[in-house]
Structure formats: C-alpha cells, structure tokens
C-alpha cells in the first residue's frame, strides 16, 4: 500500500497547530540507518488510509521527494473527540531485520461448524489480533483461521493453528498458548427467550387475527337461558 508524504521544515507545538489548520498532519519517520525525518501528510488522504486494515498491519511504501521508502505505521495520535489525526509515526523497514507486529485474525466457517450448526453453541472470538515476528517479506496483512471443525465444549489455541511460512508467535504476559476461540453452550432459558423473541418478531396478519378473535368470542359465548 502506498502513500505520499512531504518534508516538514518546522517543528514544535505552534508549528504543528498551524499545519493542522491547513489540512495537513505532522509526522515523523525514524529507525534504520538514517536520521529521523520530519514529515507531513494530507489529512484527507490519511483519514481514508487509516480506515483500511492493510495500513495498520503491512509494510507500506512512502513516496517523498521522488523517492520511495518502506515503512511501518508505529503510532497514531487521534483527537479526543474530533475526526482528526493529530500526529503519526512511521518506522523504516530493513529487509534483513525481523519485525514484531500485531496482525488481525480473520475467522471464517463457524456457521458451518458442528458447534453452531448441530449443537447450537455460541462461538466467542477471544482474540482478534496476534503478536507475531517475521521478516518484512513474510509479514501477512492478516491470518485466516477456519473454524469449521469446532465442536461443543472445545476451544482453539495458538498452537492449534498453522501460521504462515516464516511467521512466529510472540508470547505476551507469560501466555505461550493463549485461547483464540472458545465455545459455550446456550442455556435452555436463553433458547426459550430467543424463541419467544423470534415469535414476537413475526408480523401478524390482520385478517387472521380478526378471524381468530371472532372464533374465540363465539366459543366463549353462553347459550340463551331456557324459559
């Protein structure tokens, strides 16, 4: 994924504030063998870019001054209540140095699994991203995990999945095999509530309702007393 950046001449709080007024976002590029570079980006283009998953979890190509440089998004500072990026940080990428990144997990197939289709269980996505280590060329935009084999009472751990070639899981907080997905049974009470809610959501035919009411009234009417 590519984006365009421009060299930034001034730094400081005042200069950054004036830059934002003109529709630009201040940033910095650091790492590698070069010195840190002050940059600025068009805020409108940046705002659309940050909505894409690939912008957060893949090696990016930054075009600046007629040259292209490979970088990673490392930090994004947002305004507390405005839709505005206040500052952005990028790190240069060395093709020979391993990266440590968080990549999204894409789950699929759970609707066809025995746990859901046969046993009517709930599937809980415990983790939605995973910390990994790899060379830049091996960095995946996401990791696809098929849940078609899930069964009642089971769970899926990191060691149960096959990571892409060249990718290693990075343990955090002493958890070397965290749970990715868990399966829980739905209680009978919850099933009854769901069925009642579904029945209540079915639209009522006015003619059928009127006919049913008339039939009920007729059945409940008392016969006239004999003289």
UniProtKB/Swiss-Prot annotation:
GO function terms (MF aspect): 5S rRNA binding; structural constituent of ribosome
Keywords per UniProt: Ribonucleoprotein, Ribosomal protein, RNA-binding, rRNA-binding
PANTHER family for the chain: RIBOSOMAL PROTEIN L25/GLN-TRNA SYNTHETASE, ANTI-CODON-BINDING DOMAIN-CONTAINING PROTEIN (PTHR33284), RIBOSOMAL PROTEIN L25_GLN-TRNA SYNTHETASE, ANTI-CODON-BINDING DOMAIN-CONTAINING PROTEIN (PTHR33284:SF1)
Quaternary assembly: Part of the 50S ribosomal subunit; part of the 5S rRNA/L5/L18/L25 subcomplex. Contacts the 5S rRNA. Binds to the 5S rRNA independently of L5 and L18.
Function per UniProt: This is one of the proteins that binds to the 5S RNA in the ribosome where it forms part of the central protuberance.
HAMAP family for this protein: Ribosomal_bL25 (MF_01336), Ribosomal_bL25_CTC (MF_01334)
Name by which UniProt lists this protein: Large ribosomal subunit protein bL25
Lineage start: Bacteria, Pseudomonadati, Pseudomonadota, Betaproteobacteria, Burkholderiales
């Amino acid at each position: 994924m590519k984006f365009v950046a421009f060299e930034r001449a001034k730094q400081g709080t005042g200069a950054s504030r004036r830059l934002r007024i003109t529709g630009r976002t201040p940033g910095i590029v650091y790492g590698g063998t070069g010195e840190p570079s002050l940059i600025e980006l068009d805020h409108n283009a940046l705002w659309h870019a940050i909505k894409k998953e690939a912008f957060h979890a893949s090696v990016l190509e930054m075009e600046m001054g007629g040259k292209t440089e490979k970088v990673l998004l490392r930090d994004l500072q947002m305004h507390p209540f405005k839709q505005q990026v206040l500052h952005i940080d990028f790190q240069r990428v060395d093709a020979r140095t391993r990266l440590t990144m968080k990549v999204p997990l894409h789950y699929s197939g759970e609707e066809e699994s025995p746990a859901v289709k046969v046993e009517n269980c709930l599937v809980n996505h415990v983790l939605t991203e995973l910390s990994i280590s790899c060379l830049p060329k091996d960095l995946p935009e996401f990791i696809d995990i098929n849940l078609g084999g899930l069964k009642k009472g089971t769970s899926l751990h990191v060691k149960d999945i096959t990571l892409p070639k060249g990718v290693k899981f990075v343990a955090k907080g002493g958890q070397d095999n965290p749970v990715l997905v868990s399966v829980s049974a739905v209680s009978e009470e919850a099933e009854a509530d769901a069925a009642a809610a579904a029945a209540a959501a079915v639209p009522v035919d006015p003619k059928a309702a009127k006919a049913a009411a008339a039939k009920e009234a007729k059945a409940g009417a008392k016969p006239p007393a004999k003289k």
